[in-house]
């Protein structure tokens, strides 16, 4: 057996944490799971993903969950992290022999496979964001700073602390920043802010080159050896150098545990799979498990393992427990754990600061919008400059007012990609209990509303004065108010579409169709009194119609058309010819405001209920 002996790393002796900045409240935790099973129903057919998986991981151990695709690795990790929100779960998860309590999500950190980070902020700012939201309120600024510096040293990124994360921004803008391996270490660092006792990672080396993967694994090894952290991670076909870093290997096949220990090669050799020379142990084990799966032996081997040393180890680790002490997971797998360390207002302030930095540093958020507004405003001004109040001027004034409103619902198309690009980040951070939906939404909308106000005023002001529209100050500010509200209503409506649809392309297609309907039934192309009765409702629920009507009232009521005759039409006659209502412009202002507020509320509801990380 010596020729196939692969020695795994030995388990280090636990270390004590002494200073507050190292979170002295952290305890060394042993995680025990017994008879875990998980199933989902797909098209009325029940699929068993995990079947009777048991094991114990002690402090200072670095355990790999290994197996072919579809064997249940990520599912097991989700259950251990208490983040499985769908399907049926049964079994027990114990921490130091006790059932999971409200502190579990503070003691356990889960690092997902994808590096979900905001590209425009720096490494230090990212860690500070997590520190502000995850650390207790009692921590001072100095203590938070010390903690962040410790983490930067732990993950080996002190020299890159002020570098931006980097990535592709909406619109295809590439922001240079960290490498893939460095981003992965930042993700791990975010999970270490609270100095957790248990760290769970889903394929931490996936997609990384050899050097980056080894750097990530060395970070995890140091966590176990220096901090006595319990680390469990899924992994897929690692290099032999990485494979040897693990203290134990957990092998899954078809949802069953077919091996758990520190001598996997010897085990699979004993059950009939000779180990070829010069072979990566990970590849060898994967080939063996694939053969076991093809031969239908997974249940047999798992049952034999369960009845032997694994079952004995579990009994020894929890021999003093009664059945009532087992942390049995309910059928839905859901637990209501209040894992927020800070209130809604604190969450809002932290999110407001980060969102502000992102808006300033992302050109697509403001600069591009404002530049487009200036260009379109100058174009409108050139086409409609110096309009008079004669019959031709009335027609041109009506046109410029209409197209101003239409532009207010076309500009928000830029918001769709910006909003959708942040969805994955929002879902991941909310699932990690960093913050609630409400403070995130309010912080995001604070800057979105500012951008909308700026865009409306830039475009509206340039066009207003070039076209020589009604010069009264009250007329100007009312027009700007209507344009701003129309822009906000259009922006919020496009965000509703982006919440309901999944892809950016779909959102653009649906948004374009809706915008066309808005234009057609706004009262400019087709007079309201010329519409078929069956279509009348389309303009009553059209905020573009009310916006256009308000601007027309503002521009023409009280004015007289210069027609060169004794009896010239008045401004109200102009409105009547278009079939516009005689309601006051103040009423229209209230109606458009109501549309904007209703859409604003609907965006929040869609964001809160439609988009959750599905696990």
Curated annotation (Swiss-Prot):
Entry's Gene Ontology molecular function annotations: ABC-type transporter activity; ATP binding; ATP hydrolysis activity; ATPase-coupled transmembrane transporter activity
* GO CC, one annotated term: membrane
Q: Which residues bind ATP?
A: 67-74
Entry's induction text: By hperosmotic shock provoked by sorbitol.
- Pfam families in the record, alphabetically? ABC2_membrane, ABC2_membrane_7, ABC_tran
For this UniProt record, the keywords arranged alphabetically read as follows: ATP-binding, Membrane, Nucleotide-binding, Transmembrane, Transmembrane helix, Transport
Domain ABC transporter per the UniProt entry, residue ranges: 31-279
Q: Does the entry feature the keyword Cell inner membrane, yes or no? A: no
Primary site of residence: membrane
Look up and give the membrane topology term. Answer: Multi-pass membrane protein
Q: Where in the cell is it found?
A: Membrane
| GO terms under biological process | aggregation involved in sorocarp development; cell motility; sorocarp morphogenesis; transmembrane transport
Show where the ABC transmembrane type-2 domain sits.
364-610
What this protein is reported to do is described as: May be involved in cell migration.
Q: Which family does it belong to?
A: Belongs to the ABC transporter superfamily. ABCG family. Eye pigment precursor importer (TC 3.A.1.204) subfamily.
Query: Which PANTHER family would you find in this protein's record?
Result: ABC TRANSPORTER G FAMILY MEMBER 22, ABC TRANSPORTER G FAMILY MEMBER 28
Q: What is this protein called?
A: ABC transporter G family member 22
Q: Which organism is it from?
A: Dictyostelium discoideum
């Amino acid at each position: 057996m010596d020729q196939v002996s692969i020695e795994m790393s030995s388990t280090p002796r636990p270390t004590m944490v002494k200073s507050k900045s190292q979170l002295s409240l952290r305890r060394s935790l042993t995680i025990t799971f017994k008879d875990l099973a998980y199933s989902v129903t797909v098209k009325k057919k029940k699929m068993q993903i995990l079947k009777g998986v048991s094991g114990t991981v002690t402090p200072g151990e670095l355990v790999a969950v290994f197996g072919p695709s579809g064997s249940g690795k990520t599912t097991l990790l989700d259950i251990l992290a208490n983040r499985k929100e769908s399907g049926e779960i049964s079994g027990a998860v114990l921490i130091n022999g006790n059932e999971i309590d409200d502190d579990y999500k503070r003691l356990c950190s889960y690092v997902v496979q994808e590096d979900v980070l905001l590209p425009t902020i720096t490494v230090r700012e990212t860690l500070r964001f997590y520190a502000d939201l995850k650390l207790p309120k009692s921590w001072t600024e100095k203590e938070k700073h010390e903690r962040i510096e410790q983490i930067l040293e732990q993950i080996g990124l002190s020299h890159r602390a002020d570098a931006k994360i980097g990535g592709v921004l909406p619109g295809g803008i590439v922001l240079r920043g960290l490498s893939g391996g460095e981003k992965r270490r930042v993700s791990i660092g975010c999970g270490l802010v609270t100095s957790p006792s248990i760290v769970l990672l889903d394929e931490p080396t996936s997609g990384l080159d050899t050097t980056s993967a080894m750097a990530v694994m060395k970070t995890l090894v140091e966590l176990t050896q220096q901090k006595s952290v319990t680390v469990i991670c899924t992994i897929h076909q690692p290099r032999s150098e990485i494979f040897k870093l693990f203290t134990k290997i957990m092998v899954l096949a078809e949802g069953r545990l077919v091996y758990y220990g520190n001598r996997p090669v010897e085990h699979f050799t004993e059950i009939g799979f000779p180990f070829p020379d010069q072979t990566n142990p990970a590849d060898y084990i994967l080939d063996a498990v694939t053969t076991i799966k093809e031969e239908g032996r997974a249940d047999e081997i798992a049952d034999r393992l369960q009845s032997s040393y694994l079952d004995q180890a579990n009994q020894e680790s929890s021999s003093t427990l009664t059945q009532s002490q087992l942390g049995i997971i309910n059928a839905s797998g859901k637990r209501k754990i209040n894992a927020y360390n800070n209130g809604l207002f604190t969450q809002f302030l932290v999110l407001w600061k980060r969102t502000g930095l992102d808006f300033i540093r992302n050109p697509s958020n403001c600069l591009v919008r404002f530049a487009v507004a200036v260009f379109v405003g100058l174009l409108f001004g050139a086409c409609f400059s110096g309009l008079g109040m004669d019959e031709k001027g009335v027609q041109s004034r009506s046109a410029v007012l209409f197209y101003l409103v239409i532009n207010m619902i076309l500009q928000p198309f830029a918001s769709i990609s910006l909003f959708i690009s942040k969805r994955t980040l929002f879902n991941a951070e909310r699932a990690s209990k960093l913050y609630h939906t409400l403070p995130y939404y309010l912080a995001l909308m604070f800057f979105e509303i500012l951008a909308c106000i700026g865009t409306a005023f830039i475009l509206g002001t340039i066009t207003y004065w070039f076209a020589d529209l009604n010069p009264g100050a009250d007329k100007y500010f009312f027009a700007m108010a209507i344009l701003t509200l129309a822009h906000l209503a259009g922006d919020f409506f496009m965000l509703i579409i982006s919440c309901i649809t999944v892809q950016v392309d779909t959102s653009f297609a649906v948004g374009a169709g809706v915008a066309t309907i808005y234009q057609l039934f706004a009262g400019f192309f087709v007079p309201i009194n010329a519409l078929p009765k069956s279509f009348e409702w389309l303009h009553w629920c059209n905020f573009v119609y009310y916006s256009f009507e308000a601007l027309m009232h503002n521009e023409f009521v009280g004015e007289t058309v210069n027609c060169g005759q004794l009896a010239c039409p008045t401004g109200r006659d102009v409105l009547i010819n278009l079939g516009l209502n005689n309601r006051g412009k103040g009423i229209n202002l209230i109606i458009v405001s109501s549309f904007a507020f209703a859409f604003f509320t609907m965006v929040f509801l869609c964001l809160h209920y439609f988009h959750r990380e599905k696990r």
